[in-house]
Amino acid sequence: MIRGSIPALVTPFKNGELDLDTLKKLVDWQIAEGSTGLVPVGTTGESPTLSHEEHETVIEAVVQAAAGRVPVIAGAGSNSTTEGIRLIRFAERVGADAALVVTPYYNKPTQAGLMAHFTALHDCCNLPIVIYNIPGRSVVDMTPETMGRLAQLPRIIGVKDATGKIERVSQQRASCGAEFLQLSGEDATALGFNAHGGVGCISVTANVAPRLCAEFQQATLRGDYATALEYQDRLMPLHEAIFLEPGLVGAKYALSQLGLCSDEVRLPLVGLTDPTKARIDAAMRHAGLI
């Protein structure tokens, strides 16, 4: 079952190449710490700067490392429907449990174009699909009405909502039904998101604080919002500090401070400034991570 704390995994590099040994260790650590799912090659996995071959290699490596212990929701989005079909078919072939598919970016499809794109992906395979709606990056915003029509397809099972609009959860419950999975795509607002009916978060911060994020999610899902608020207060400085610069760069730096992963990223991303490093260090101390 897809719910709870689901890290959008970083993709480790070593001297410019994929570091699959470290990736597999991160998968084991995440599962041991309580993460309830994994998303390889999303935005946080630096998918824009991976080749198609690397993209597929990372998906397969995470599926193999997870070995059925938690669901793997493979990043399979593209602004080309043809490329999206290739990626989602590969994810299905290697044993992913679902695919995370971002709304096509840059070419700005209409709502009719979004319907056609996601319908084509749905019809090309038997893999469950989670829509990824992130208008801040893709420029297009899937409306609750369009999502409701897509939710009628049997394998469109949910959404990662990164609109930052908490009211969308209630609107999408109305258009898609209460059983449609709604996962927050924004760590800082995940508390309110779940209070409105969400069931989890595809998280950047969970790369660094998987146990805290998992326990936070568990508290919300059992309706214990007093405990969840205590976790929120502990994690909020880290949510903010990680995103002072691109979030995946912050997450990799924090992981490097824990001795779990290099902070190496690919251009055009660059390493953090010293003031941001200091903020992340302070937030990690506040959370009790270092």
Swiss-Prot record:
GO terms for biological process: diaminopimelate biosynthetic process; lysine biosynthetic process via diaminopimelate. It comes from the Bacteria. One of its GO terms (cellular component) is cytosol. Gene3D superfamilies: Aldolase class I. Catalyzes the condensation of (S)-aspartate-beta-semialdehyde [(S)-ASA] and pyruvate to 4-hydroxy-tetrahydrodipicolinate (HTPA). Pyruvate binds at T44, I202. The active site is at Y132 (proton donor/acceptor), K160 (schiff-base intermediate with substrate). The gene is dapA. Pathway: Amino-acid biosynthesis; L-lysine biosynthesis via DAP pathway; (S)-tetrahydrodipicolinate from L-aspartate: step 3/4. PROSITE patterns: DHDPS_1, DHDPS_2. Belongs to the DapA family. The record marks T43, Y106 as: Part of a proton relay during catalysis. This is 4-hydroxy-tetrahydrodipicolinate synthase. Keywords: Amino-acid biosynthesis, Cytoplasm, Diaminopimelate biosynthesis, Lyase, Lysine biosynthesis, Schiff base. Its main location: cytoplasm. Homotetramer; dimer of dimers. One of its GO terms (molecular function) is 4-hydroxy-tetrahydrodipicolinate synthase activity. Its EC number is 4.3.3.7.
